[in-house]
């Protein structure tokens, strides 16, 4: 029986002289899953992807792609992987159509099948307007889409993409995210990104890497739940903030903090991410507060990311 685990990274290490870029990391990506690989610059994301795709050797550990050892059988692995490298490199003097034709030739397609593969890739990433233009004349966003087209041309089982929406405008980002969501149904997808909203939009799981180590691996909502403002309640009053409101809120044993904004609203932060919306709405009703809107905040991924990567960086510096 074929396993659902399509990417298996086991105790992977990469050293450059005395510098450790990847430090004994392990994770799996299953069929039908999109894993977002997050981390600050220099964290080890791109190095890990280069090793997984067989473009760089490891210093230790191993990578299995659909059960195949990537180090022992690099060509076999590359046949079943679609890879969008950092910066989406391509031959600048080639036109979009000739470059994709070149990729199709490398992949072994000929005749009608080759033509159809190229057409499908162009249609999926909306490259029709630039197919006869040299790649070096294209905008950063179009170059990225050319790179994405070559990665999906052969309809791979596994997709590995380094910053797939880098340089795209909001509409293009939306289109690419929709495409990734559609493809994720029958593929294993690994993307690296520094765009935290992307994790929330398209990823089933998020892994945060810093200093070459994975410090979080879980669902985006689990990451969001680590935010100090997870389950916080924001109240906007119709006229002004009632004088007694802060006092009444602070005495609640589930409330950690109450902050008033310049715009006349309150942000009520719960202790330990507890859900407090029912208590707040009951109090608002009892006190007859004149409320324009009230809502619960899910939390902010950026503050969680900043907190845990900074803590790890500071701990690392103390040990150097």
Q: Where does each model-flagged region fall?
A:
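A short linear hydrophobic-aromatic micro-motif
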Residues: 126, 174, 254-259, 290-295
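ABC transporter nucleotide-binding domain
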Residues: 176-271
């Amino acid at each position: 029986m074929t396993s659902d685990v399509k990417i298996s990274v086991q105790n992977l290490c990469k050293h450059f002289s005395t510098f450790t870029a990847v430090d004994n990391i392990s994770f799996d990506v299953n069929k039908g899953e999109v894993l977002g690989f997050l981390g600050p610059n220099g964290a080890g994301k791109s190095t890990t992807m280069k090793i997984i795709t067989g473009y760089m050797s490891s210093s230790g550990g191993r990578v299995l792609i659909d059960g195949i050892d990537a180090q022992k059988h690099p060509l076999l692995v590359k046949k079943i992987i679609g890879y969008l490298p950092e910066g989406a490199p391509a031959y600048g003097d080639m036109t979009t159509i000739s470059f994709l034709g070149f990729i199709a030739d490398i992949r072994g397609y000929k005749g009608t099948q080759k033509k159809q593969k190229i057409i499908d890739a162009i249609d999926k990433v909306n490259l029709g307007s630039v197919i006869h233009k040299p790649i070096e004349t294209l905008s950063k966003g179009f170059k990225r889409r050319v790179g994405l087209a070559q990665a999906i041309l052969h309809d791979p089982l596994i997709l590995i993409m380094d910053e797939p929406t880098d340089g795209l405008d909001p509409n293009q980002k939306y289109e690419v995210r929709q495409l990734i969501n559609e493809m994720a149904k029958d593929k294993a997808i690994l993307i690296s990104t520094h765009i935290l909203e992307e994790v929330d939009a398209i990823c089933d799981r998020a892994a945060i890497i810093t200093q070459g180590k994975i410090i979080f691996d879980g669902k985006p909502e689990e990451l969001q739940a680590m935010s100090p403002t997870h389950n916080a309640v924001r109240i906007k009053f119709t006229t002004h903030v009632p004088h007694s409101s802060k006092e009444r809120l602070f005495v609640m044993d589930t409330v950690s903090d109450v902050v008033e904004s310049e715009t006349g609203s309150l942000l009520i932060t719960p202790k330990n991410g507890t859900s407090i919306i029912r208590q707040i709405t009951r109090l608002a009703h009892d006190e007859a507060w004149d409320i324009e809107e009230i809502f619960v905040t899910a939390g902010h991924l950026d503050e969680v990311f900043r907190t845990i990567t900074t803590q790890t960086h500071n701990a690392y510096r103390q040990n150097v």
